[in-house]
Amino acid sequence: MRKAALHNLGCKVNAYETEAMEQLLEAAGYEIVSFEEKADVYVINTCSVTNVADKKSRQMLHRAKAKNPDAVVVAAGCYVQAAADKLREDAAVDLIIGNNRKADLVPLLDAWFAGKEIRESITDLAGSNEYEKLHINKQAEHTRAFIKVQDGCNQFCSYCIIPYTRGRVRSRRPEDVEEEVKILAEEGYKEIVLTGIHLTSYGIDFKDEGIDFLTLIKRLHEIDGIERIRFGSLEPRVITEEFASELSRLPKICPHFHLSLQSGCDDTLKRMNRHYTCEEYADRCEILRKHFRNPAITTDVIVGFPAETDADFETTREFLEKVHFYEMHVFPYSRRAGTRADRMPDQVPETVKKERSAVLLKLEKKMSGEYRSSFAGTEQEILLEEPVTINDEVYMTGYTKEYVKAAIRLDGRDPKALKNTFVSGILGDFLTEEILILNEK
């Protein structure tokens, strides 16, 4: 039996596709081993979101070949789409598989081991409207399942290469999504997270059928066994009164919304080619707070974007504090060859990016603590996931619908028996900076 090892780089969509490829290999008779072990096949699902991501992808490919020079090293994913010519010349890489062709992994390996000259499976995504059918019937995480429902992006933000490496928007058939979710529910999963490259574009290619993102959500809400539905990153403009009102009527929806912002300065947003203003973004947050009680609103922020002045940054900081997020993912701007932002003048020095990041991370810590504190004394239900030791005492941790982490005392109970079960109680004091104690009823 041949051994295969896989390594994922990048986003949740990539992670989903890596698990799907792993299951394809298992079904074909491969033994899946750790990437640290010697294997006959190494598959690296690459990322190309920044120049640094490109470098990491190359490093992992060479690391795999160094582990076993006789192994077949497969480069898959976004870096393949961005740099296929370079990979064809790289002696560490044997096979290359682009996005929308990952289902070809096993046939490509079969051809390799049969001595055939086929070395790649790549398509030009610019003109492709085909959604690649990849399925998962089990996941590495045993309580929360990520479901890819959409691929591609039509937004063309000035700093982003993804529309070129992932192609235009392509949606997964709703009945196909339903089938996978039903299988996962039968496997015992109680929570799903819908994910995609530009999630809220779901259904724009199904307009003639009257199918949109909300349609999909409502259909999944009807599936027995699934108790919670979360979303990946959402486009702020999807948050309308109608959308929020409809969601608020669905009890399985988690009031946890990640609205990608990137900057709190209108001038910077314009240079980024984001399609909203700060005022419009703030209005969307208020709509969510109108229809959901104390929802968790999280976001992404890029600091040090080309031409961002000290005044621009201060405008962003003030805006973030005003909106008051639960969590913020703060990224120093990282150049990506092939994007408009990479060619922009007035690139910000790395030292300035680092300083600005530190300011926002300090603000994030403050706001996050304040949001968690707002739940103290409230009755909550958490889905238990894993044990943790705090001050020599063992607890079982889980999350509320808002993704606030809490823990119960085990008191001698078997953590395996508690995993993936719900427990209710009153949230109390902090056990750590990020974990509240849940006093069971």
Where is each model-derived feature located?
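Hydrophobic, well-ordered secondary-structure elements that form the walls
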Residues: 259, 300, 320, 328, ...
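Short, solvent-exposed loop/turn segments at secondary-structure boundaries
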Residues: 53-55, 168-175, 203-209, 271-274, ...
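Generic beta-strand/beta-sheet core signal
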Residues: 7, 76, 195-197, 232-234, ...
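Terminal RNA-binding accessory module
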Residues: 343-441
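Proteins enriched for Cys/Gly/acidic motifs involved in redox and nucleic-acid/cofactor modification
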Residues: 1-202, 218, 242, 257, ...
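Radical SAM/AdoMet-radical enzyme domain recognition
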Residues: 186, 214-215, 219-228, 239-299
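Short, electropositive alpha-helical surface patch
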Residues: 207-218, 241-255, 308-326, 350-355, ...
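Conserved strand-turn element in the central/C-terminal portion of the radical SAM core barrel
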Residues: 156, 160-167, 228-237, 263-274, ...
